[in-house]
Amino acid sequence: MSHLDNGFRSLTLQRFPATDDVNPLQAWEAADEYLLQQLDDTEIRGPVLILNDAFGALSCALAEHKPYSIGDSYISELATRENLRLNGIDESSVKFLDSTADYPQQPGVVLIKVPKTLALLEQQLRALRKVVTPDTRIIAGAKARDIHTSTLELFEKVLGPTTTTLAWKKARLINCTFNEPPLVDAPQTVSWKLEGTDWTIHNHANVFSRTGLDIGARFFMQHLPENLEGEIVDLGCGNGVIGLTLLDKNPQAKVVFVDESPMAVASSRLNVETNMPEALDRCEFMINNALSGVEPFRFNAVLCNPPFHQQHALTDNVAWEMFHHARRCLKINGELYIVANRHLDYFHKLKKIFGNCTTIATNNKFVVLKAVKLGRRR
């Protein structure tokens, strides 16, 4: 846990999933402090919109203003709810919207934590363009190293005149005034042909490797299991290309597409609808934190390309949680398949959790591993 003192309230905040006690990662950053400082002497009129509030620092601080928390991360929503409870703040004080929803009209203040991907930022700025006014105070913040010329140009192009502040504690802010500059419409998704198939893959803004097949997925697809039955999970499904391939290779199986990103799940659904519509009755689509709340001993197989970062921080906490959830939800003799960068050494992590691990394939960058849930159902 970490403490954030600001002009609105003193907060105790924690990350979600929780990090280990040896190397704890902080649940807020200097950009959060810097953003809140700008509102110290501001009379807030109209709705408050907060975008990409990773662990709820801004939402908790501004809870008395009934803010809208907007983003593309279910884990961030869970983190915000947990930190509201931790600080004795009514959860209903914050209203949660995903980035594909319509934003509230005529906001008084918009606070933006600049996301990792420029595509997501553009989608969010275009959505804001439909609701902000010249009187809306628009402030974005991030580590100074993460604000580039392209970031500022995007604000200018979509919303209007943009300036940046001096760095403070290695953070920098962007101030923007809306003046409705001319803007060409942009498609909601980016599409490309999947090599070796007649499929067209459609990606929403925040999907990993948006403009083509990432090399890890390409390697994984060469080693996917075939002729499975029962339920299979594409965990952390992204655009669903792994699950789509599983549907094709395992015609007797049902595939459950799971991701914490609403845009990823929407992309997966769209890709099944447009490429294998006849398989929709063998699909389930789930926005979730890994397999939280899913009953144990349910699945025959889980396939996963786990992330090794959360927002801008490098961490294996999300991967660890995925592995533990997979073990709990697999049937006896059910199998977990993962692809990962070789340097992450997930072989020993899986062996610790499952008691076994087998290398299926490897190249100079990636490894495909399999672990089996052994033992008896109790």
Curated annotation (Swiss-Prot):
Q: Which reaction does it catalyse?
A: guanosine(1835) in 23S rRNA + S-adenosyl-L-methionine = N(2)-methylguanosine(1835) in 23S rRNA + S-adenosyl-L-homocysteine + H(+)
Any one Gene Ontology MF annotation carried by this entry is:
nucleic acid binding
The record, for Pfam families, names: MTS
Q: Where in or outside the cell?
A: Cytoplasm
Enzyme Commission identifier(s)? 2.1.1.174
Enumerate the UniProt keywords alphabetically: Cytoplasm, Methyltransferase, rRNA processing, S-adenosyl-L-methionine, Transferase
What residue stretch is flagged as signal peptide?
A: none
User: One GO CC annotation, please?
Assistant: cytoplasm
Stated family: Belongs to the methyltransferase superfamily. RlmG family.
Q: What does this protein do?
A: Specifically methylates the guanine in position 1835 (m2G1835) of 23S rRNA.
For this entry, the protein name equals Ribosomal RNA large subunit methyltransferase G
Source species, please?
Answer: Escherichia coli (strain SMS-3-5 / SECEC)
